[in-house]
Swiss-Prot record:
<feature type="binding site">
    <location>
        <begin position="530"/>
        <end position="534"/>
    </location>
    <ligand>
        <name>NADP(+)</name>
    </ligand>
</feature>
<dbReference type="GO" id="GO:0050660">
    <property type="term" value="F:flavin adenine dinucleotide binding"/>
</dbReference>
<comment type="similarity">
    <text>Belongs to the NADPH-dependent sulphite reductase flavoprotein subunit CysJ family.</text>
</comment>
<feature type="binding site">
    <location>
        <begin position="154"/>
        <end position="163"/>
    </location>
    <ligand>
        <name>FMN</name>
    </ligand>
</feature>
<dbReference type="InterPro" id="IPR017927">
    <property type="entry name" value="FAD-bd_FR_type"/>
</dbReference>
<dbReference type="GO" id="GO:0000103">
    <property type="term" value="P:sulfate assimilation"/>
</dbReference>
<dbReference type="GO" id="GO:0070814">
    <property type="term" value="P:hydrogen sulfide biosynthetic process"/>
</dbReference>
<dbReference type="GO" id="GO:0005829">
    <property type="term" value="C:cytosol"/>
</dbReference>
<comment type="subunit">
    <text>Alpha(8)-beta(8). The alpha component is a flavoprotein, the beta component is a hemoprotein.</text>
</comment>
<feature type="binding site">
    <location>
        <begin position="118"/>
        <end position="121"/>
    </location>
    <ligand>
        <name>FMN</name>
    </ligand>
</feature>
<comment type="similarity">
    <text>In the N-terminal section; belongs to the flavodoxin family.</text>
</comment>
<dbReference type="InterPro" id="IPR001094">
    <property type="entry name" value="Flavdoxin-like"/>
</dbReference>
<dbReference type="InterPro" id="IPR023173">
    <property type="entry name" value="NADPH_Cyt_P450_Rdtase_alpha"/>
</dbReference>
<dbReference type="InterPro" id="IPR008254">
    <property type="entry name" value="Flavodoxin/NO_synth"/>
</dbReference>
<feature type="binding site">
    <location>
        <position position="358"/>
    </location>
    <ligand>
        <name>FAD</name>
    </ligand>
</feature>
<dbReference type="GO" id="GO:0010181">
    <property type="term" value="F:FMN binding"/>
</dbReference>
<dbReference type="InterPro" id="IPR001709">
    <property type="entry name" value="Flavoprot_Pyr_Nucl_cyt_Rdtase"/>
</dbReference>
């Protein structure tokens, strides 16, 4: 078979590995190819580990449980890894892998498949699940009559397409003849208990189908090598760091309060790569908690049980419970507790619920929808009703190549007003209010889907309006530290030049030094007609297209609901106008860039 005809379906390689192999060998002549072929064969024979390198599925199928995960953050991988460890303890042979590294050619050989997958954006598969998701939906997908499977879907019920990717996998596997071990398990943001129950249930369901003759977990997991060197500080065990700076970087006349926050990681040993996020645990505002307690007529010192801990109600609401983000289940529950005709009507309409939760918090439910007389909502029932507090993720705005043990964030203070009452975002208000020396509990959340090119000479195009510019500040610090010679281009936008040009002097210095090749800005309200970054992209379309043809990597960070979609449409228009592509071919072009890791998004 010719190398140019090679695909993951006809080799033991995944598609990303195939593409990398093609790229590495494209410039070799026949003599060089022959030498490389001989060298690799000799290396493989010398290792004496050919049997060890064979896919786990080459073992008798009934002996192996394959566990695949697809997740934008590390939650899915953590659930899958914990399941693999439990399966090992029960004597099972396990193949654990990211969906992005899994060779779909193996699928028809599987007999036991357990999937953990999240949903990203508006019902979209996370980056590492896209290829498998597409394959299962295609005509190439085989019949899977010998397969037993189970799917754990991760999602956030405050979004319309809750757990959609998991639903897609479940439906498609069933349509291909596979048999479900359990009904689809849908997990909200407080997924820990449901995931733990799934672990127990699915291993019980697997037991009659497998012989426990193996006792080794085969980790076909690109992240497994990294696990050994990870910091002891995690989401479950965060590091208590010190706030060094929380400085407003928008002007006095701006209607936006954006903070530059610097945090000292001290001697924690925490390491991050540019593109990663910082998880921030926060406490709810005490004044907000007092308002809720007064509105419900509940005593602050009432004893409640949260998990295995007995604490007073006020402490539980400050430290343990989500108060600033509503979700559909809570709106529906409160509608029933209040018997409010208005809220009941809202709770029955998905779009009305979606709009309602964007502009209301739990305190608004308490203030505006009084409980009916027989609601009987006591302190313990209240904490059961509210879902657990979860950390917020912020794109890291620094490189440790420059700031060493510090980590920098760009935080927009979330502010809203409802019936004259100001409401603030939980984490953003916590960070904005933090004084020098204050403690904040943090951990690093890796994002392998938002990485600079391995070759510093590769050009990069960075599109980051508003606080979406944060990771590109980190990118530039890293590129300077690398001595990168590749061109770099930033698109930035915000309402006003004088008030909202985040990190203006830094960008100007990068331009002056030649580290940043060019910058195009869009200040939407500095003229009669609004101008956004997507307009600048179209204006510079010919040059942008040439950069892409020269191998540039393309990055987008910021708002997923509107900005990222508008920017994508602008990029498609550029490909049509300046690349001469049809609309369908333009979509395929950017899909190819994405699969080659040349088109990456960090959107939220």
């Amino acid at each position: 078979m010719l190398l140019k005809e090679l695909s993951s379906l006809a080799s033991p390689l995944s598609q990303p590995q195939v593409e990398k192999l093609k790229q590495l060998t494209a410039e070799l002549n026949a003599v060089q190819l022959a030498w490389v072929s001989g060298y690799l064969a000799a290396t493989a024979n010398a290792s004496g580990n050919l049997a060890q390198l064979a896919p786990v599925s080459d073992a008798p199928a009934a002996q192996t449980v394959t566990i695949l995960y697809g997740s934008q953050t590390g939650n899915g991988r953590g659930i899958a890894k914990a399941l693999a460890e439990k399966a090992k303890a029960q004597g099972y042979s396990v193949n654990l892998a990211s969906m992005g590294e899994y060779n779909v050619r193996q699928l028809k050989q599987e007999t036991l498949l357990l999937l953990v997958v999240s949903t990203h954006g508006e019902g979209e598969a996370p980056d590492d699940a896209i290829e498998l998701h597409k394959f299962l939906a295609s005509k190439r997908a085989p019949q899977l009559n010998n397969l037993h499977y189970s799917v754990l879907a991760l999602g956030d019920s405050s979004y319309e397409f809750f757990c959609q990717t998991g639903k897609d996998f479940d439906a498609r596997l069933s349509a291909l003849g596979a048999k479900a071990l359990l009904p689809l398990v849908e997990c909200d943001v407080d997924y820990e208990a449901a995931a733990g129950q799934w672990h127990a249930d699915v291993l019980t369901a697997v037991k009659p189908l497998i012989q426990t003759t193996a006792n080794v977990v085969a980790l076909n997991d690109t992240g497994s090598a990294q696990v050994a060197s990870e910091s002891e500080f995690t989401k479950q065990n965060p590091y208590s760091a010190e706030v060094l700076v929380s400085q407003k970087i928008t002007g006095r006349g701006s209607d936006r309060d954006v903070r530059h926050v610097e945090i000292d990681l001290g001697e924690s040993g925490l390491r991050y790569e540019v593109g990663d996020a910082l998880g921030v645990w926060f406490s709810n505002n005490e004044t907000l908690v007092d308002e809720i307690l007064a509105g419900l007529g509940l005593a602050a010192d009432a004893t409640v049980t949260v998990g295995n801990e007995s604490i007073n109600l006020k402490q539980a609401l400050i430290e343990k419970k989500e108060l600033t983000q509503l979700y559909p289940g809570l709106v529906k529950a409160w509608a029933e507790l209040s018997a409010s005709p208005e809220l009941l009507a809202i709770s029955e309409d998905k779009e009305q619920v979606r709009q309602f939760i964007l502009h209301h918090q739990f305190a608004d439910l308490v203030a505006n929808y009084q409980l009916k007389a027989d609601a009987n909502l006591d302190a313990n029932k209240l904490v059961e009703l509210l879902r657990p507090l979860t950390p917020r993720l912020y794109s890291i705005a620094s490189s440790q190549s420059e700031v060493d043990t510090e980590v920098h964030l760009t935080v927009a203070l979330v502010e809203d007003e409802h019936q004259g009452q100001a409401r603030f975002g939980g984490a953003s208000h916590f960070l904005a209010s933090a004084e020098e020396g204050a403690e904040v509990k943090v951990y690093v959340e890796p994002n392998k889907h938002f990485r600079l090119p391995e070759d510093p000479q590769t050009p990069v195009i960075m599109i980051g309006p508003g606080t979406g510019v944060a990771p590109f500040r980190a990118f530039m610090q890293e590129r300077v530290a690398q001595g990168a010679e590749g061109d770099s281009w930033l698109f930035f936008g915000n309402p006003h030049f004088e008030q909202d040009f985040l990190y203006q002097t830094e960008w100007q210095q990068y331009l002056k030094n030649g580290d940043l090749t060019r910058i195009d800005v869009a200040f939407s309200r500095d003229q009669a007609h609004k101008i956004y970054v997507q307009h600048r992209i179209k204006e510079q379309g010919q040059t942008l297209w040439q950069w892409l043809q020269n191998g540039a990597h393309l990055y987008i960070c910021g708002d997923a609901e509107r900005m990222a979609k508008d920017v994508h449409q602008a990029l498609l228009a550029v490909a049509v106008e300046f690349g001469g592509l049809s609309s369908e071919a333009a979509e395929e072009y950017f899909e190819t860039l994405r699969s080659h890791k040349r088109y990456q998004k960090d959107v939220y």
